[in-house]
Swiss-Prot record:
Keyword Amino-acid biosynthesis recorded: no
UniProt GO cellular component terms: host cell cytoplasm; T=1 icosahedral viral capsid
SUPFAM superfamilies, per database record: ssDNA viruses
Domain of life: Viruses
Organism of derivation: Bdellovibrio phage phiMH2K
Region of interest called Disordered, as start-end residue ranges on this chain: 333-353
Keyword Ribosomal protein: no
Main location: virion
Annotated protein name in UniProt: Capsid protein VP1
Function: Assembles to form an icosahedral capsid with a T=1 symmetry.
Family: Belongs to the microviridae F protein family.
Amino acid sequence: MKLGSRHNQHSFAQIPSVHTTRSKFNRSFGTKDTFKFDDLTPIFIDEILPGDTINMNTKTFIRLATQVVPVMDRMMLDFYFFFVPCRLVWDNWEKFNGAQDNPSDSTDYLIPTITAPAGGFENMSIYDHFGIPTQVANLEINALPFRAYNLIYNDWFRDQNLIGKIAVPKGDGPDNHADYQLLKAAKPHDYFTSALPWPQKGMAVEMPIGNSAPITYVPNAGNGPYPHFNWVQTPGGPGNNGALSQVTFGGQKAISAAGNDPIGYDPQGTLIADLSSATAATINQLRQAMMMQSLLELDARGGTRYVEILKSHFNVISLDFRLQRPEYLSGGTIDLQQNPVPQTSSSTTDSPQGNLAAFSTASEFGNKIGFSKSFVEHGYVLGFIRARGQVTYQQGLHKMWSRQTRWDFFWPKFQELGEQAILNKEIYAQGNATDSEIFGYQERYGEYRFRPSEIKGQFRSNFAESLDVWHLAEYFTVKPSLNKTFIESNTPIERSLVVTRPDYPDLIGDFWFDYTHVRPMVTYGVPATFGRF
């Protein structure tokens, strides 16, 4: 009798494989939106199914509001695309899909929601940019994409040294609509924006000098002109000055010696620590302290998100999905191209022939901004745009002008010392004592490696008749501090635009997403016949 091999025998430990039909869909679409400089504005949102494969290229045409003049500065548009699994923004996502820790656990869950307030979601709000109808009161919507927005901001656009985490609810909801609003990304790093608020992450490591030292008495009180002790015989009466030998307690004198010698106390102290006999730190303890300080300095410079620790300490790049964080898919940057418009039909003296105005546009119709990606779990793909200008400063004094001693200059022997201070006058000179206070910390001799752009002459914003409409340099009305206000992108675009109303958009955009989607579903949703017809 011939027996079958164990490979073709039935196994109760297995289930049959699922052969899911996958179909290709052209889901290309367009969107038109208005937005402001510096805001991290959503332009794309789509839900993802396990087994999806997408290929997308972004085509865009963007126009800046009419300018007073053609600005002599670079203006850029950054695009970002991320994937956020549902399980990262809802703790009970797996249970919602049927998972149980115990056989009797409930799987009766509903997607967390947000309810619109009275008056509905506002125009130009984050809800508007996600495509939610505005001005509709009590509208109930899925909260997970908004949680994903906040999570992406925390992990990718927030300066962890200066800005605290924003709320990312992960419970069953409902969420408060006020928890979600348009956020601003941190400025690109330069000499000032990459400054640290401290020279190391955490407390500075102290030098080990041992545990104890003997105390020695120094008899230096002497017989100086110290005052006698005073005491009062009658409450509220005058004090009596006298020798301590005249004071009695129960008939006994306070001291037995006769005379009027006073008792004195030396305010300079009579005890010293004899460090010649102190216990000493070992060389290994000194090495350990130095290496610990070096590690904390690297933590400060490299960052302490786990992915940053792996890169800065081990030179290992861990994939985003392995660290349970939003996965960066793709991005790109395009420039706004400025077009001067000369006055050719002057009819007033304040707009002579040849007077310049300007308009700016940006376009991308190639494959520069896009990606291809296959997915293995439920989630959302989110796309963002951010408009920004090149950051320039105009009120600081370069460190070169403040060098006085030999040690203020570069020396090769000193280039591996710790972080050096950036003084306030380097970014905002005032000519007073605050100039020498610390703004932040930068790598040793960083000013030799970075050359800032400059603003001079009538371009300076403090000029009585300034021409600062021609550029986008920062101008501080008060001394800046290294904090959230400073680090968030804040391009002064309004001074270069004709219309400066806060409710008026800086840019208008037309976006076309060339979007091919392969999904685990049949091409057409034909009702099943169950083999009967």
